[in-house]
A protein has these predicted regions:
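Sequence-level detector for tyrosine residue identity
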Residues: 8, 48, 75, 144, ...
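Zn2+-dependent cytidine deaminase-like catalytic core
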Residues: 33, 38-136, 221, 252-254, ...
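A short, flexible N-terminal coil/short beta segment enriched in small residues
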Residues: 36-43, 136-149, 238-241
């Protein structure tokens, strides 16, 4: 019995995920080449600036099967590009290879592509089918879709908490809530994102490095939201800013009286970004998110503290949550909550999340949630 378009597209979507942490700010894309109801090639976008999924899939076809590419069907999880970037247009490669049919899961919202690849292939005589397994494919490219459509990054909130929901004691002590294996998992997550961000409270309390250890191939930018320019010059973040990209986001109004401190931060290697004067804290945060996205940040992991996570929640900008629950019962009415901010007054206005993954890490529980699309 012949396999369906949905079956082959599921293979393409699965292949796309092999690029996670390597291709951003490009989207993860997979491609499967099928001839005579048999998969003859499979590929994915492997690294930023490298060949795209379609070319990798055709290259993977064994020599004795190369003649089957002409007349084959290509299943692509995202519309093939039609413009010259770091690589040539993928639709041109499919046309040149004499692919007969192209099945697409998601039409690319990028104005440089958006239907143009489809039109170009149709003019060349290729049959094009769209909207196959779209929901599943959109989950994989959700960060790219958000940045392309809204100019904002995909925000991943990460925190560790006790079983009664505290991220620190009333005194601010938080080391350690989760176990060593969970903390190693955090470094794996850092290697997958474009930037890691904390608020100044966390930076002052923990004096963190925020870089993935061991380092991955990608360079992760460290971001500190520091409205009043309080980050010490002898902090680990500042002292290592020549080694790891470090952006300090300050309030443009406060910056007027902190010229010497800002100059010292910049001399140490930090990049200092100033918001437009006169903005409130949430407006400044949204402005910062737009700045990061416009500079190639697709995936932004925010590691606290409660104030910045609360502000992001109030702005409806938390897209994904990675939660490590340590097997500790803390108590105390003044213990610190992971998400502060204003929050809604009614439970039915709370941000609805969908559980994606649950994993036991020794005596910790690791959970992943994604925001439910309210559209």
């Amino acid at each position: 019995m012949p396999k369906t378009d949905q079956h082959y597209m599921s293979l393409a979507v699965q292949a796309a995920q092999n690029g996670q942490g390597h291709v951003e700010p490009n989207p993860m894309v997979g491609c499967v080449i099928v001839a005579d109801d048999q998969v003859i090639g499979i590929g994915w976008h492997e690294n930023y600036g490298g060949p795209h999924a379609e070319l990798n899939a055709m290259t993977s076809v064994k020599a004795e099967l190369k003649d089957k590419i002409a007349g084959a069907t290509a299943y692509v999880s995202l519309e093939p590009c039609s413009h010259q970037g770091k690589t040539g247009p993928c639709c041109d490669a499919l046309i040149a290879a004499k692919i007969a049919r192209v099945v697409i899961a998601v039409v690319d919202p990028n104005p440089k592509v958006s239907g143009q690849g489809i039109a170009k292939m149709q003019v060349a005589g290729i049959e094009v089918v769209t909207d196959v397994l779209t929901d599943k494919a959109e989950q994989v490219v959700a960060p790219y879709l958000k940045r392309t459509r809204t100019g904002l990054p995909w925000v991943i909130a990460k925190w560790a908490m006790t079983i009664d929901g505290s991220i620190a004691s009333a005194s601010g002590d938080s080391q350690w809530i989760s176990n060593e294996k969970s903390r190693k998992r955090v470094h794996d997550l850092r290697r997958r994102v474009d930037a890691v961000m904390v608020g100044i409270g966390t930076a002052l309390a923990d004096d963190p490095m925020l870089n993935p250890r061991p380092a991955g191939k990608r360079i992760v930018t460290r971001v500190v939201v520091d409205s009043a320019v309080r980050l010490p010059l002898d902090s680990k973040l500042v002292k290592t800013s020549n080694e790891f990209p470090t952006l300090i986001a300050v309030d443009g109004e406060q910056a007027k009286t902190q010229a010497d401190k800002i100059a010292a931060l910049e001399a140490s290697g930090c990049q200092v970004w100033q918001s437009n004067p006169g903005r409130d804290s949430n407006q400044r945060l949204l402005e910062l998110l737009k700045h990061l996205a416009s500079n190639g940040v697709t995936n932004l992991m925010v590691e606290g503290g409660g104030q910045i996570l609360g502000a992001l929640n109030d702005l409806s900008q938390i897209d994904e949550v990675h939660l490590f629950t340590g097997a500790k019962l803390l108590g105390g009415e003044n213990a610190r909550s992971p998400v502060a901010g204003t929050g809604p007054s009614l439970m039915n206005a709370a941000t609805q999340m969908q559980l994606q993954q649950v994993e036991r890490i020794d005596n910790d529980v690791y959970s992943v949630y994604r925001r439910v699309n309210e559209a």
